[in-house]
A protein has these predicted regions:
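C-terminal amphipathic alpha-helical interaction region
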Residues: 68-97, 102-188
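Ordered, small/hydrophobic-rich secondary-structure cores
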Residues: 1-18, 174-186
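ATP/Mg2+ or Mg2+-diphosphate-binding catalytic cores
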Residues: 4-66
Length: 188
């Protein structure tokens, strides 16, 4: 039940990212999606007796002068916004967290997509031009329900969610960072 709840929670977190939902917290949706997805996959791995790879490291950031300059300017301007009873500090901080995430994503997107495309290609035995095509193939593999691929799927999806967490945090996995917190074992 715990694993099922966590996976449904990850899906629900996506609703926070809908820009049309009044009161939705976009950045919280991103954070929850990454961390809950990863934790759910860790729980599945525990139940199945799988060992997961945490030895991932961010590469040197890619230089994207236009995106970097624009997002940094947005961060500076958001930090200067006056606060009031109608727009409090925490709301300004949440607003600023969006371009901060996008800045990190801009820096590491090529790595994230390259690694994910490569791993999906290894799983399905094909080469893909972009992440969209790789994800479509991955969706087909999942829909096929071939239990022989479950172990590889758990490992692939865990690495993907761990990479996203790394991008959000701007760091390698760190046990001191709540984003990388591992849940207590389910089976104990």
């Amino acid at each position: 039940h715990t694993v099922g709840f966590m996976q449904l929670s990850a899906i629900a977190a996506m609703t926070f990212m809908n820009p049309e939902v009044r009161g939705a917290n976009w950045i919280e949706g991103v954070l929850e999606y990454a961390s809950i997805s990863r934790r759910g996959l860790e729980a599945i791995a525990e139940l199945d007796g799988l060992t997961l790879d945490y030895d991932l490291h961010l590469p040197e950031p890619t230089k994207q002068p236009w995106e970097t300059s624009g997002l940094e300017k947005l961060l500076v301007d958001i930090a200067r916004l006056p606060v009031s009873s109608a727009f409090e500090d925490w709301e300004r901080d949440l607003l600023g967290a969006i371009p901060q995430f996008l800045l990190n994503y801009t820096r590491y997107r090529d790595w994230f997509e390259r690694e994910t495309i490569h791993e999906i290609g290894q799983l399905v035995g094909e080469r893909f031009e972009d992440l969209s095509a790789a994800d479509a193939a991955l969706s087909n593999v999942i829909a096929d329900g071939d239990a022989d691929r479950d172990e590889a799927l758990v490992r692939l999806l865990h690495k993907r969610s761990l990479r996203l967490s790394m991008i959000i945090a701007g760091t390698d996995p760190d046990d001191e960072n709540p984003l990388f917190h591992k849940l207590d074992p389910i089976l104990e």
